[in-house]
Amino acid sequence: MDLLEELMVKRKWVKHCLRTNCAAPEDIQLTGKVKVAKIYSNLLYKREKEPELYDAIKAVAPEWWDDETRMILNKDLVAQRHKDGNKGHSWILWLGDYTSGGGLNFDDGTKIEGKRQWFKIDGQNHHWNDPHEGGTKYSIVLFRSDKKPKTNTLNEARKRKIEREKVERDYVLDVQF
């Protein structure tokens, strides 16, 4: 766990993601036609992006689904009430030097909290977390999915648009000459 926590601290965090379902309204912006959440919450699903972190998570994971394993990495996230997109259970782990708070709440009144231990949850039930105090809070959420990440879908749409525009430009040039 110590290595994993150290890697989470050293990680380059990007305050930009597509998880608008858990972001506060003031953290959501429109970038072109896409809603973007200005929160530290990033998907890690390919080992080659961050191999050392990926391997450290895998080494302590309570369950692993090979190519269907997905990881959400969060830093100081105060998630709004939401449901997760995956079907089935997820696992969550909290790390960091925060001193208190940050519990995960469910509509049925259940509340879980505690550092450095995995909790099995059903993300299909509405849930949110409390603010934490004193320091930085990291969370790792493991879940199973065979869906392509939203970023892949967006990148494919961008590529199709660029290709369409190129075809249209070439057509206009052909017609002019």
Question: What feature does the model see in each segment?
Answer:
Residues 1-118, 124-177:
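Fe(II)/2-oxoglutarate oxygenase catalytic core
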